[in-house]
Amino acid sequence: MHILLNLSLISVLFIGCQQIVQSNTNQNFSDILKNSPRIEGKQEYLQSPFSTTGNRVYMVGHQDGTFPDLGWHIEGEMGGIWNHPIKLMDGFDIQITEASESFKLNKADKFTNYPVANVHSFSWKDKKLEIERWQFVPDDKQGLVVQLIIKNHGKERNLNLKFTGHPDIIPTWLGDETGMEDGKDQSVFDSEKKLWKIKDDLNEWYALFGNDKETSVEKTSLNTLEDTISLKAEETYVINYVIAGSYTSEQEAYATYNDIKNNMNSYLTAKRERYEELANRSKLTVPDKDIEQVFEWIKYSCDWTIRTIPEVGSGMCAGLPDYPWWFSCDAEYALKNHMAFGQFETAYNTIHLLDSISEVTNGNGRIAHEISTNGAVFNKGNVNETPQFVSLIWDLYKWTGDINFLKRYFPTVKKGLNWVMTERDENNNLLPDGYGMMEIEGLDGEMIDISAYLQRAFIDASKMASEIGDNKLADEYKTKAIALKEKINSVFWSEESKSYGDFIATDEQALKTIANAIERAEDMKQPWVIEELKKKKKYIKENPSSEIRAFAIYHSYVVNTPMEMNFADEDKALIALETAKKFTSQFGVYVTGIDKDTREDTNNENVKRESAFSYESAVMPMNAGVLAVSENNYGRPNEALDYIKKATTTFSYAYPGGMYEVSPDFGMMNQTFNNYAYGVPIVNQFFGIDPQAAKKKVVIKPQMPDTWDNASLENVLIADNTISVYYTKSDGLLTLRVEQENSDWEVEIIIPKKDNINSFEVTKSSVEPEIVDGKYVFDSKASTTELVLKYE
C-alpha cells in the first residue's frame, strides 16, 4: 500500500509517545488463563503459521513472532490482521531498547497455544528479561488485544518500548466483483486519543491502534508508539496494545477500540468460560488419550473458523490462511460433527448463509461452492454439493426436531434435487454428470461421489417429505433412492480394481482420462504413477468393452462413498475396504490413491511439504474420516479406530492445537472439515447415538473398538435433552449406563445378542428388554438406565 500523509498533522508524525509508568497491577492474560488447557509448539516449526481467531477478526503470523508474506489467493496478503471483508494490517514489530542496545521480538524461544489465546515467549538473556507477547480476539468484536508481559530478573532498568504497526487496508478476494476499490492509506496520529488512525482514502475503511498508557507526544516516526518504563528488580510490567477497525465508519472503529480497551479482561474471561462450555459438551473419556485430547481441541477449532460478516452472514469457513470464507462441501462434511459436538448455532447459521447466497446466485436449488466474504461467488457449485446439502438439512433436523427449520428449507431441497436430475442428467439414467469432490481435469462425467451422495439425498428427502406430510413425494424420492442403490452397486463396481470406480464411462472416455492423468503425473514427476496408468491403459485395450463400465483410474478416496453412505452391497464393501488400505500412509488416506509410490523401498512416510502450494501426493485427515465412517458402517470399529489414529498423528504436528489440511504440515494450518474423523465416527458410531429429536427419542446402539473397554461420552446435546453414555467391558461383563436430563424423552438401547466376536446375555437391567431381529431392545424414560450383559 502507498502511504498518504495528512499534511495538516505532519508535525506529529515525528513525535513520540513517552511517559514513565509503573507496573500495571491489573490481572494479566496469563493469570486469567492459568488453569486453561494449552499446547506448546515445536522448535522446528517456530517459522510456520499460527492464528489468533475471533468470529469477526483474526490474526495470522508465524510462531516466532514475525509476520512474513503468506498465502496465494491474494498473493502474500493472506496473513496479518483481517476484519473481513477488509484487511487491517500486515502485522507489527515490537522492539525493546535499553540505552544503545535493542531487542526485537521476532525470534521467539517458544510458542504456546490456548483455546482462546496464544503467547510467544522471548528471553533477552543479557538483560535478564523475560517477555511474553499474548494476543486474543474478543467475541463479536472488530479488534484484538496484544499484551506484553515483561519480567525483570535483573537490576532496575529504564526501557523504551517501540510498537510499529504496518497498516495495509485492502479488500478481500473478489472484492472488485462487488465494487470494492482499493485506495491509498492515510495515517494520522490522534493526539487526543493517543492512537494511530489509518483510513483508506476511497472508502470508509479504518484501522486504529494504540495502547492503554497515558502517553505524551514527542519524537517518533510514522505508525509507531513509544513508551518509556522504569522496571525494578523482580518487577513485572504489563502493557496492552489494542487494534481495531471498521469497514463502515470511523465512529464504529473508535467505539470498538474503546470498548475493547476498557473491557479486555472481562471479554477474555467470558470467552474462556464459553470455551469451557464447548469442552464440556460431548465430553469424551477413552483409553486413547491422544484421541481424547484431539476430540477436545477439535471442538475449539470448530469455533476458531466461524466467520461473521453481518451484511453477508455467519458460518464456518474452510480454513486459514487461504480459505477464510465459506465452502459448501466443507460445511457439508464438517457440520455433521458440529451437531455431534452440540454446536447447533454454527450449523443453523452456515446453512442459512449457503442457502441465501445460493438462491441469489443460482435461484434453482443449486448450492454454491465457494463464497468470498463480500458475498461474491467464485464457483456456482459442484454437482455433489447440492445433494450433500439436502442431507445436511435432515441431519440437523434429527438433532433439533425443529419442524419450522425443515419447512423453511424443504423448498430448496426440492429445487436442488430437480436441478440435479433435469440439468445434470442429460441421458436420464439417474447418474448425473459433472464435477464432484475431485476437481481434476476430466473428472466431470458420471462420478461415484455425486451418485452416492445423491442416493443418500433421496433417502433423506423422502423422510423430510413424510415429516411435512407429502407422502406422494416421499414415495417418489424413495423409489429413486432404491433404484440408485441398485444401479450404483451394479455399474460402478470394478472387479478388476476390487473397488468402486472413480467414474463410469466408455473405453474411449477412460483412455482419454488416462492420457490426462499421465500428463498430470509427468508434470508432478511421478514415474510410479505413469507406470501404473500404462498398466491400466493396457488392460483396457486388451479387455475391451462396448458397454459403459466403471474405472478406478485415480483411485481417489471418493471411491469409498458407497460405504460411507452405507448402501454398498456387503460383499463388495468388505473387498473395497481392504483395497482402500493400500492407499494409506501413517497419516491417513491419499486424496488420489495413485499418488502413493508403491515401489519397493519407497518411504511414503516422508511427506513434509517444502514446495509451493500444491496438493501433490496429498494425504488428508478428512479422508481418513470418510474411511472411518465407512468401516463403522460395516461393523468394523477396530479398523475405523485405525483411521482415526492415523488422522490423529497430524494433530499438533506443526501447529499446536491444530490439524493441517494436508498431513502432516501442508496447506491450511487448520481445516474445519478435519472434524469428520472424530464427530460422526465416535459420537454416532462408536457410542451409537442416533438422535430422533422430533420424536423426543434417542437410539443408542454402541459398537466400540476392542481397546476401548472403558469409555464415556457426557453431555451430548439433543434438542432440549442432554444424554451421557458410560461403557465398560471387563471380566466377561459389559456394563452400559445411559443418563438423560429430560424424562419426557424415550431412550432406546440396542445390543446384538451376538456380534462378530461375542454372544451376549442380559444379567441385570433396570428395564426388561424385548428381542427384535436377534437384538436386545431396551426402552426407557428413566433419568438413568443401566444394564449389564455377560459376554463370551
Regions found by a protein language model. Name each.
Residues N6-G16:
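Bacterial N-terminal signal peptides
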Residues C17-P287, M669, I689-E792:
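Terminal accessory carbohydrate-recognition/targeting modules of carbohydrate-active enzymes
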Residues V21-S51, N203, S249-Q251, M264-P324, ...:
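Low-complexity, Ser/Thr/Pro/Gly-enriched N-terminal "stalk/linker" regions
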Residues L70-E75, K107-D109, S123-K125, E132-F136, ...:
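Asp/Glu-centered strand-loop micro-motifs enriched in Gly/Pro and often flanked by an aromatic residue
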Residues S191, L278-S301, F341, E345, ...:
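Active-site acid/base region of carbohydrate-active enzymes
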Residues T308, R366-K380, P432-M447, N606, ...:
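Acidic/His metal-coordination segments adjacent to aromatic residues that form catalytic metal sites
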Residues S314-W325, K336, N364-G381, E385-V390, ...:
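Active-site lining segments of carbohydrate-active enzymes
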Residues P324-A347, H352-E359, P411, G445-A452, ...:
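Active-site core of glycosidic bond-cleaving carbohydrate-active enzymes
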